[in-house]
Amino acid sequence: MPTLTSYFGFLLVALTITLVLFISLSKIRLI
């Protein structure tokens, strides 16, 4: 199932990027 693995990997990367952006915005708001 290469397609399922690729989809899961893409979802994981998207979630990581979203989490990093959210943390960055939170830090900017704190400052």
Swiss-Prot record:
The keyword Transmembrane helix applies. It is a single-pass membrane protein. Its main location: plastid. It is found in: Plastid, Chloroplast thylakoid membrane. GO terms for biological process: photosynthesis. One of its GO terms (molecular function) is electron transporter, transferring electrons within cytochrome b6/f complex of photosystem II activity. Keywords: Chloroplast, Electron transport, Membrane, Photosynthesis, Plastid, Thylakoid, Transmembrane, Transmembrane helix, Transport. InterPro entries: Cyt_b6/f_cplx_su6 (IPR007802). GO terms for cellular component: chloroplast thylakoid membrane; cytochrome b6f complex. The chain crosses the membrane at residues 3-23. The 4 large subunits of the cytochrome b6-f complex are cytochrome b6, subunit IV (17 kDa polypeptide, PetD), cytochrome f and the Rieske protein, while the 4 small subunits are PetG, PetL, PetM and PetN. The complex functions as a dimer. Belongs to the PetL family. Component of the cytochrome b6-f complex, which mediates electron transfer between photosystem II (PSII) and photosystem I (PSI), cyclic electron flow around PSI, and state transitions. PetL is important for photoautotrophic growth as well as for electron transfer efficiency and stability of the cytochrome b6-f complex. PANTHER family: CYTOCHROME B6-F COMPLEX SUBUNIT 6. This is Cytochrome b6-f complex subunit 6. It comes from Populus trichocarpa (Western balsam poplar). The lineage of its organism: Eukaryota, Viridiplantae, Streptophyta, Embryophyta, Tracheophyta. The gene is petL.
